[in-house]
Swiss-Prot record:
<dbReference type="InterPro" id="IPR036796">
    <property type="entry name" value="Ribosomal_uL11_N_sf"/>
</dbReference>
<dbReference type="InterPro" id="IPR020785">
    <property type="entry name" value="Ribosomal_uL11_CS"/>
</dbReference>
<dbReference type="GO" id="GO:0022625">
    <property type="term" value="C:cytosolic large ribosomal subunit"/>
</dbReference>
<dbReference type="InterPro" id="IPR036769">
    <property type="entry name" value="Ribosomal_uL11_C_sf"/>
</dbReference>
<dbReference type="InterPro" id="IPR000911">
    <property type="entry name" value="Ribosomal_uL11"/>
</dbReference>
<keyword id="KW-0699">rRNA-binding</keyword>
<dbReference type="InterPro" id="IPR006519">
    <property type="entry name" value="Ribosomal_uL11_bac-typ"/>
</dbReference>
<dbReference type="InterPro" id="IPR020783">
    <property type="entry name" value="Ribosomal_uL11_C"/>
</dbReference>
<keyword id="KW-0488">Methylation</keyword>
<keyword id="KW-0694">RNA-binding</keyword>
<comment type="subunit">
    <text>Part of the ribosomal stalk of the 50S ribosomal subunit. Interacts with L10 and the large rRNA to form the base of the stalk. L10 forms an elongated spine to which L12 dimers bind in a sequential fashion forming a multimeric L10(L12)X complex.</text>
</comment>
<protein>
    <recommendedName>
        <fullName>Large ribosomal subunit protein uL11</fullName>
    </recommendedName>
</protein>
<dbReference type="GO" id="GO:0003735">
    <property type="term" value="F:structural constituent of ribosome"/>
</dbReference>
<keyword id="KW-0689">Ribosomal protein</keyword>
<dbReference type="InterPro" id="IPR020784">
    <property type="entry name" value="Ribosomal_uL11_N"/>
</dbReference>
<dbReference type="GO" id="GO:0006412">
    <property type="term" value="P:translation"/>
</dbReference>
<comment type="similarity">
    <text>Belongs to the universal ribosomal protein uL11 family.</text>
</comment>
Length: 141
């Protein structure tokens, strides 16, 4: 018999650096989940991706057990890393803060394609390029 689901928790956490401090502690504590068990499991599974922000979906069951699914890093984080910038532009249509190539957009799409709803590679690359433009990053050939 399958376990009954109590709820879902969605968080974005730095890989290998989950700790009981907010936002993890309050979100998991409200559902009655063992916070330290989650932190240890998460840090063990993400130690090779250190420094990246990873979305995680935690499924909490009525017996207070949990499972979690790791997603690929947000496109904005990958684009900032590719363009070697700390933040996007405050005025993306006026100020350009960095450059990425279409080849870099294709590499980001390959990392993100499991989590994206683009029909094919060309549409996925256009989506990533659109995200870059909205951040003030110029897309060059």
């Amino acid at each position: 018999m399958a376990k009954k689901i109590q709820g879902y928790i969605r968080l974005q956490l730095p890989a290998g650096a989950a700790n009981p401090a907010p936002p993890v502690g309050p979100a998991l504590g409200a559902q009655g989940v063992n916070i330290m068990a989650f932190c240890k499991d998460f840090n063990a599974r993400t130690k090779d991706q250190n420094g990246m922000i990873l979305p995680v979906v935690i499924t909490v069951y009525t017996d207070k057990s949990f499972t979690f699914i790791l997603k690929s890093p947000p496109a904005s984080v990958l684009l900032k890393k590719a363009a070697n910038i700390a933040t996007g532009s405050g005025k993306p249509n006026q100020d350009r803060v960095g450059k990425v190539t279409k080849k870099q957009c294709a590499e980001i799409w390959k990392l993100k394609k499991a989590d994206m709803n683009a029909k094919d590679e060309a549409a996925g690359i256009k989506t990533i390029a659109g995200t870059a433009r909205q951040m003030g990053i110029e897309v060059v050939d």
